[in-house]
Amino acid sequence: VKLIHSYHKEAVFHRAFDITPNLEESIQTLISLHVDRVLTSGGEATAIKGQETIKYLQEHFGSHIEILAGCGINADNALEFKKYTHVKQLHSSCKSYKIDATTSNGKVSYGYYHDNEMKYEVVNCDQVSKLIHNTQ
């Protein structure tokens, strides 16, 4: 964290936080280390499932560390989620998939998915625009 801050950047802790045995103790540790932000789904598979915990973290620790809610957030649920939890930042992949035949030759594949070796993720600009529009 000191190294990151020495370059005038923010220290963000990723969702490894969500698998710690005690989220409250873990967030206090991150605060004591001067981490600026934590990406979390509230210790659940999605932020929607973890919204009670995220709301609690925001209410009790949000003035000391920024709570960045993510995993399962999209244009259709973002505004209600934001209003309920009072988080100021949301993380969303806004992804769709493209097919590129050049990613595989039958022996070697650079694709991400076993169901289709030629499929890869891209940011869907329409989803991003809708997310921004719906949360303004």
Question: What are these language model-derived features?
Answer:
Residues V1-F13, Q51-N74, D115-Q136:
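Alpha-helix-loop-beta-strand connector modules within alpha/beta enzyme cores
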Residues E10-P21, D36-A47, L68-G70:
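Catalytic beta/alpha-barrel core
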Residues D18-L33, L57-S63, I67, I73-S92:
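Catalytic cores of alpha/beta
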Residues E24-E25, K49-E52:
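Generic recognition of short, well-ordered alpha-helical segments
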Residues S32-R37, E117:
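A polyampholytic, Gly/Pro-enriched intrinsically disordered region
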Residues V35-K49, T85-V108:
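Glycine-rich phosphate-binding active-site loops on the catalytic face of alpha/beta enzymes
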Residues G106-N116:
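Active-site gating loops and adjacent loop-to-helix segments of metal-dependent hydrolytic enzymes
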